[in-house]
Amino acid sequence: MADFEELRNMVSSFRVSELQVLLGFAGRNKSGRKHDLLMRALHLLKSGCTPAVQIKIRELYRRRYPRTLEGLSDLSTIKSSVFSLDGSSSPVEPDLAVAGIHSLPSTSIAPHSPSSPVASVLLQDTKPTFEMQQPSPPIPPVHPDVQLKTLPFYDVLDVLIKPTSLVQSSIQRFQEKFFIFALTPQQVREICISRDFLPGGRRDYTVQVQLRLCLAETSCPQEDNYPNSLCIKVNGKLFPLPGYAPPPKNGIEQKRPGRPLNITSLVRLSSAVPNQISISWASEIGKNYSMSVYLVRQLTSAMLLQRLKMKGIRNPDHSRALIKEKLTADPDSEIATTSLRVSLMCPLGKMRLTIPCRAVTCTHLQCFDAALYLQMNEKKPTWICPVCDKKAAYESLILDGLFMEILNDCSDVDEIKFQEDGSWCPMRPKKEAMKVTSQPCTKVESSSVFSKPCSVTVASDASKKKIDVIDLTIESSSDEEEDPPAKRKCIFMSETQSSPTKGVLMYQPSSVRVPSVTSVDPAAIPPSLTDYSVPFHHTPVSSMSSDLPGEQRRNDINNEVQLGTSSDTVQQ
């Protein structure tokens, strides 16, 4: 089976000339396009080719990718095959022979001594052209030991084509290579069962045929990476690639974001007919790429969340130890941190945490919501921590047990503070504290303002008594200490007053001051507004002309009020 796969990869890397030589050697039709020639050659290989055909395939591949010639037998075999091609009817075969010999590097021909006459003859025959040919670069292995990074949202069910190098087959910039794979009846059944019909005639599959490309590097697991000018065809149909990502800076060439390619919609869901993949790309100096095809099952964010919960919740003591480590005083530092404030709001959804989660690689205590994080990466997989902007892969996520306890104990707090010993306390919002302290103050002020005028209300005509109380201090002239401007506001005003009188009575504070002097002589009552500082100057009432309308009537009312006040004081 390994030999068959190796021969198949060799045939897939052949050019038109090699395919024509192989088909002509096997007695098959060698006319047509490259796609037709390749399908005939693969069918020849699959139908059970003879050992002679297998030797011919290896021989053509050795010419196509020469490395080292081991022994004179290999040289004589190549030499005889080259000369046998001269009498062939194909017009491209002499070119193949020349190309096959010219592609041999000079370092591969070790024997220059007379002990190898065949090699010397070979060198003599091709000496003029051999000196013009430059040494070819080392050919990468067909199946490099490349490992791709695991994709959290996909479970690998089977490997259809293991990682295979995209080998540069010519000196041209644009390269092309073909790959063949077939599905088993069980694989076809799984794909068909998972099919879901979407609006518009589209189909979706949870079991998918996935194509991945990456750099042919074996040092570490590789992320998906596309070569330049990539073009993929599946069974002759062009596969639409993801769009270009915006360049980070001006002048930088745009690149497609590396991600796995779901080619299920173009795959023949039959175990009797093989599938062909054509990949063309622009070669780059110093960069080799690899491709692979897998049968995978797509997962959802809810499934990943369930798997994350099955891993268990991390012990709260781990987080407490991290808190103590952060709050431990550093003797070399002049600044000591005694507490640490942490929010219980998710930085992704700006909502209260439900499943606190963070990565093991993160050094901060702030958590984010696991459900929102998985949903975000399901739409666009970035796996970046929303707190510190560092890599937070799914495999490194943990559920914080300490934050689980805090969320269960405090349901009305959005922020907490950690102490040096690992304990915590809730942080109440300042607005709530201000509301609590301001409510009793409001009650006291309202009671003091509205209760005092009631103590001076006279049983007779209410409206007149209020006006009388306000006009009480018109003729008084004694000095008194100043009151705050806030207490000079008059809350009793008559709608029947004339406009000149209203202008004076607006600043009458007697309704506030009278109750405080009810137990003293009437002579001690502040008689006039002229002794109080006001925010602006106004004409004193005493200086007003007595010719004003109703002035005599007001003087009579003032005398009556003074007598009434004196009598009330005596009765008390």
From Swiss-Prot:
Its main location: nucleus. A motif (Nuclear localization signal) lies at residues 484-492. The modification Phosphoserine is found at S476, S477, S478, S499. GO terms for cellular component: chromatin; nuclear speck; nucleus; PML body. It is found in: Nucleus speckle; Nucleus, PML body; Nucleus. Residues 11-45 form the SAP domain. Residues 467-473 are annotated as: SUMO1-binding. Its EC number is 2.3.2.-. Changing K326R: No effect on auto-sumoylation. The keyword Transcription regulation applies. The keyword Glycosyltransferase does not apply. There is a cross-link at K46, K249, K430, K435, K443, K452, K489, K502 (Glycyl lysine isopeptide (Lys-Gly) (interchain with G-Cter in SUMO2)). A motif (LXXLL motif) lies at residues 19-23. Changing K431R: No effect on auto-sumoylation. Keywords: DNA-binding, Isopeptide bond, Metal-binding, Nucleus, Phosphoprotein, Transcription, Transcription regulation, Transferase, Ubl conjugation, Ubl conjugation pathway, Zinc, Zinc-finger. A zinc finger (SP-RING-type) spans 331-412. CDD domains: SP-RING_PIAS2. Mainly expressed in testis. Zn(2+) binds at C362, H364, C385, C388. GO terms for biological process: androgen receptor signaling pathway; DNA-templated transcription; negative regulation of androgen receptor signaling pathway; positive regulation of dendrite morphogenesis; positive regulation of DNA-templated transcription; protein sumoylation; regulation of androgen receptor signaling pathway; regulation of DNA-templated transcription. Changing L304A: Loss of enhancement of AR and NR3C1-dependent transactivation; no effect on interaction with AR and NR3C1. InterPro entries: PINIT, PINIT_sf, SAP_dom, SAP_dom_sf, Znf_MIZ, Znf_RING/FYVE/PHD. The LXXLL motif is a transcriptional coregulator signature. PANTHER family: E3 SUMO-PROTEIN LIGASE PIAS2, ZINC FINGER MIZ DOMAIN-CONTAINING PROTEIN. Binds SUMO1 and UBE2I. Interacts with AXIN1, JUN, MDM2, PARK7, TP53 and TP73 isoform alpha, but not TP73 isoform beta. Interacts with STAT4 following IL12 and IFN-alpha stimulation of T-cells. Interacts also with GTF2I, GTF2IRD1, IKFZ1, DAB2 and MSX2, as well as with several steroid receptors, including ESR1, ESR2, NR3C1, PGR, AR, and with NCOA2. Sumoylation of a target protein seems to enhance the interaction. Binds to sumoylated ELK1. Binds DNA, such as CDKN1A promoter, in a sequence-specific manner. Interacts with PLAG1. This is E3 SUMO-protein ligase PIAS2. It comes from Rattus norvegicus. The lineage of its organism: Eukaryota, Metazoa, Chordata, Craniata, Vertebrata.
